[in-house]
């Protein structure tokens, strides 16, 4: 009998020993802090992007509109130089790491440098031309274009609720634009081009980060580096460089401070965008930008100085804002449900494996 008893309790060869319930509980408790940290990092990345995006719009608006700085290209050039300088110093001091240049780097980054340049310049130009409420409401189109880009490049699908809220945002933008007394055709064209480029840039950044070839610092560095000389050439041949040199505000300390801040914020925003996209998604990054724009819309109405109030325009702005809030809520809840479903499937798979 003793022998039979020993055989019953002896582990079978090739079979893993069963885990005790206490051990399983310890594993589950050990996973909780890691999951909490991941959520915290996602929220931190999203918040960092929102604050950075808010500050750069306000500072750029002040430099280009309030001080009437004549060259959006030169502001963009300053942002590129600041990005390259900060990352080069960081790499030299071994604070950040990214691959050295080789002949494969252009292939690994393409088409991001072109999208980065176009996104930056059209964004600056439209900031100069449009009042802040209309600038922010027309930025809603970037969500629509991001959906198209993620569908085409990342094969993502979107629910009926998401599509309806995006439709509401676009309708609100059209209503607001129909009664925009400060209408500027160039500003409208540039902001819509900027929306397309923002969407394409976000989707491609996610694609490049997933490939893990250059990393976020490498993408930031080489995007800016490759476009410095082309931007300088364009600024020279269009006369923008000459206008910038002849600008009378260089003696103004407050202007110099804001111009420098604009250049540095260009790098910080690029970093925040890549960070938010890495920890979340291109669509989440766009949502955060959208929520930030709500704040800018109302601040621009009161303090912008170039907003002309009409009821139709005001109602259109608020329709778009309401749509963006509902959209953000639906997207967030869908993401949480998706994660819960994935976690449930993993547990089911483990349970079947244990049996």
Swiss-Prot record:
Cited InterPro entries: Sugar_P_trans_dom, TPT_transporter
Compositional bias annotation for Basic residues: 1-10
Keywords: Endoplasmic reticulum, Membrane, Sugar transport, Transmembrane, Transmembrane helix, Transport
Primary location group: endoplasmic reticulum
Catalysed reactions, semicolon-separated: UDP-N-acetyl-alpha-D-glucosamine(in) + UDP-alpha-D-glucuronate(out) = UDP-N-acetyl-alpha-D-glucosamine(out) + UDP-alpha-D-glucuronate(in); UDP-N-acetyl-alpha-D-galactosamine(in) + UDP-alpha-D-glucuronate(out) = UDP-N-acetyl-alpha-D-galactosamine(out) + UDP-alpha-D-glucuronate(in); UMP(out) + UDP-N-acetyl-alpha-D-glucosamine(in) = UMP(in) + UDP-N-acetyl-alpha-D-glucosamine(out); UDP-N-acetyl-alpha-D-galactosamine(in) + UMP(out) = UDP-N-acetyl-alpha-D-galactosamine(out) + UMP(in)
Region named Disordered: 1-27
Molecular-function annotations in GO: antiporter activity; pyrimidine nucleotide-sugar transmembrane transporter activity; UDP-glucuronate transmembrane transporter activity
Gene Ontology CC annotation, any one: endoplasmic reticulum membrane
Membrane topology note: Multi-pass membrane protein
Record note on disruption phenotype: Neonatal lethality. Skeletal development is severely impaired leading to reduced snout and body length, and extremely short limbs. The proliferating zone of epiphyseal cartilage is disorganized with densely packed round chondrocytes and little extracellular matrix, in contrast to the regular columnar organization of chondrocytes in wild type cartilage. Chondroitin sulfate content of cartilage is significantly reduced, associated with reduced proteoglycan aggregates in the extracellular matrix.
Function summary: Antiporter that transports nucleotide sugars across the endoplasmic reticulum (ER) membrane in exchange for either their cognate nucleoside monophosphate or another nucleotide sugar. Transports various UDP-sugars including UDP-N-acetyl-alpha-D-glucosamine (UDP-GlcNAc), UDP-N-acetyl-alpha-D-galactosamine (UDP-GalNAc) and UDP-alpha-D-glucuronate (UDP-GlcA), which are used by ER glucosyltransferases as sugar donors for the synthesis of sugar chains of glycoproteins, glycolipids and oligosaccharides.
PANTHER family noted in UniProt: SOLUTE CARRIER FAMILY 35
Family assignment from sequence similarity: Belongs to the TPT transporter family. SLC35D subfamily.
Protein name per the record: Nucleotide sugar transporter SLC35D1
């Amino acid at each position: 009998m003793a022998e039979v008893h020993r055989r019953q309790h002896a582990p079978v060869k090739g079979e893993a020993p069963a885990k005790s319930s206490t051990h399983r509980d310890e594993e589950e408790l050990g996973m909780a802090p890691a999951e909490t940290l991941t959520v915290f990092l996602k929220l931190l990345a999203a918040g960092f992007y929102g604050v950075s995006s808010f500050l750069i719009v306000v500072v750029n608006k002040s430099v280009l509109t309030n001080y009437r700085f004549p060259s959006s290209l030169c502001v963009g050039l300053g942002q590129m130089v600041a990005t390259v300088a900060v990352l080069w110093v960081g790499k030299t001091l071994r604070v950040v790491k990214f691959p050295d240049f080789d002949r494969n780097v252009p292939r690994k980054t393409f088409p991001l440098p072109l999208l980065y340049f176009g996104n930056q310049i059209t964004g600056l130009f439209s900031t100069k031309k449009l009042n802040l409420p209309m600038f922010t409401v027309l930025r809603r189109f970037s969500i629509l274009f991001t959906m198209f880009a993620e569908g085409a490049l990342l094969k993502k699908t979107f629910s009926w609720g998401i599509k309806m809220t995006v439709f509401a945002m676009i309708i609100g933008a059209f209503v607001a634009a129909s009664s925009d007394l400060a209408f500027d055709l160039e500003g409208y064209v540039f902001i819509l081009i900027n929306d397309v480029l923002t969407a394409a840039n976000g989707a491609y950044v996610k694609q490049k980060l997933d490939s893990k070839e250059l990393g976020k610092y490498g993408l930031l560095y080489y995007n800016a580096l490759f476009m410095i000389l082309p931007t300088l050439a364009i600024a020279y041949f269009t006369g923008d460089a000459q206008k910038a040199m002849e600008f009378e505000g260089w003696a103004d300390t407050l202007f110099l401070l804001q111009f420098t801040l604009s250049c540095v914020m260009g790098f910080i925003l690029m970093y925040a965008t890549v960070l938010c996209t890495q920890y979340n998604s291109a669509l989440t990054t766009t949502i955060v930008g959208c929520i930030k724009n709500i704040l800018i819309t109302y601040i621009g109405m009161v303090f912008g100085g170039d907003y002309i109030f009409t009821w139709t325009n005001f109602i259109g702005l608020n329709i778009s804002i309401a749509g963006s809030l509902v959209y953000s809520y639906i997207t967030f809840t869908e993401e949480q449900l998706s994660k819960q479903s994935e976690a449930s499937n993993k547990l089911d798979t483990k349970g079947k494996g244990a049996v």
